Amino acid sequence: MHEHLAQPVRETSSGDLFIEGDWFPNPLPANISLDEMAYPDTSYSFTTFFSEKPVGFSLGYASGNYGHGVFTTGKNGEINVGKFAVLQCTRIICDLSVTIKDHCMFSWGSVITDRWLTANTLSPDVRRQMLKEAAHSPTRHIESPDPQAVLIEDNVWVGFEAVILPGVTIGQGAIIGCKTIVTEDVPPYAVVVGNPGRVIRFLDPTDTEENRQQLISQLLG
């Protein structure tokens, strides 16, 4: 889907899609889905996007990628962003699955990754071989041997330069403080800060459908 976007997109005779006025000259990848009123920002965000999935990236209704966020994927990576979400200069690194649901907000410099490449998880010989293979790959992408899916539930706010590590699920309505390193699952409506992240309090769950409908009624008079 590429109609009724927040940015005009033109299709060339060869089928390539370009964002009108984009400062970066590359076309958008063919295997991404942009819902109505979505704001992809720039094709620069996809310079390290190597997903071979039928739909390797989806940006939901009225969601936006702002400030030159970057989406780095391996051939099996799949990034899904729900409705009314804001990604502000966010880096997503995905070899398996990163899912961001509706009404989420990511502040500038935040990072989400579903992959590990550390000295503790791979031997020097294995890492050396992976580097050799990447050097001869057209994409230069190093595939993680053990990616772990990341799930961000509805209405989550992530502060600037926070890092969400592989295998983490963040529950609905949670807040992640700036520069927090999230290493384990976060309960719904928890406020998490620090390195490693720890819960310091819980919020009242006011983002219910009943409250939402009441606010809409008030706004519409």
Cite the ranges covered by each PLM segment.
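Short linear motifs in intrinsically disordered
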Residues: 61, 181-182
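Binuclear metal-ion centers of metallo-dependent hydrolases, dominated by the metallo-beta-lactamase
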Residues: 176
